[in-house]
């Protein structure tokens, strides 16, 4: 699947995805400062399902055509299986397809791929407005940030919470939650994933 955005420093002004793509290669092309850049297309959730938000795609993930295919990313998918968001037998190489199949969605603050932690705060902050627009259009039940840095930038302030509900943080009227960090202690991970499991089980049918 491919598309082209208008000129912009990060391609964030391209049209927001409405249709939910089927399984397969999720690569797309945007324009960044007038040059084509390969990235991953947004995978919108169904209304009143969960929207997971990361920082930006890794080059490994873009090359694979699927979200979160580096080491930390695959840990994220494993955690969603533990939380029963995804079936326990979900293949990691196409876990984003399984996420879409159960009604949830995924996007990033910044669509330009970089190495881990290479994206600047300024570049990530530039994507917050577009994220608001996506949430307003898609209307998920809640936003779940994969990483605390993404949550902090979207909130526009420091966050005390290590995981769970983010009081006072909402996007387009939707509540926001944070997953435990990739290197969080096991007890914290277990508590956080149980919390996420409870959120998912409370979603309307």
Where in this protein do the model-derived segments appear?
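C-terminal capping/extension of enzyme domains
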Residues: 2-47, 70-72, 116-132, 157-205
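Short, glycine/serine-rich, charged loops/turns that create anion-binding
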Residues: 57-59, 111, 150, 183
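Short glycine-/acidic-enriched loop or helix-start segments at secondary-structure transitions
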Residues: 61-64, 153-156, 188
């Amino acid at each position: 699947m491919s598309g082209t955005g208008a000129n912009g420093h990060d391609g964030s002004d391209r049209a927001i995805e409405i249709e939910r793509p089927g399984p397969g290669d999720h690569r797309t092309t945007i324009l960044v400062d007038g040059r084509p850049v390969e990235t991953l297309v947004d995978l919108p959730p169904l209304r009143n399902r969960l929207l997971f938000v990361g920082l930006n795609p890794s080059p490994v993930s873009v090359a694979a055509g699927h979200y979160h295919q580096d080491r930390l990313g695959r840990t994220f998918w494993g955690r969603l299986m533990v939380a029963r968001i995804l079936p326990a037998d979900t293949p990691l190489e196409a876990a984003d397809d399984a996420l879409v199949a159960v009604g949830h969605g995924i996007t990033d603050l910044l669509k330009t791929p970089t190495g881990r932690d290479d994206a600047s705060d300024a570049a990530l902050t530039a994507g917050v407005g577009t994220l608001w627009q996506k949430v307003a259009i898609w209307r998920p039940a809640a936003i779940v940030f994969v990483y605390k840095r993404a949550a902090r930038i979207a909130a526009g302030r420091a966050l005390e919470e290590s995981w769970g509900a983010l009081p006072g943080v909402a996007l387009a009227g939707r509540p926001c939650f944070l997953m435990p960090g990739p290197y969080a202690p096991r007890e914290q991970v277990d508590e956080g994933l149980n919390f996420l499991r409870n959120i998912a089980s409370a979603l309307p049918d």
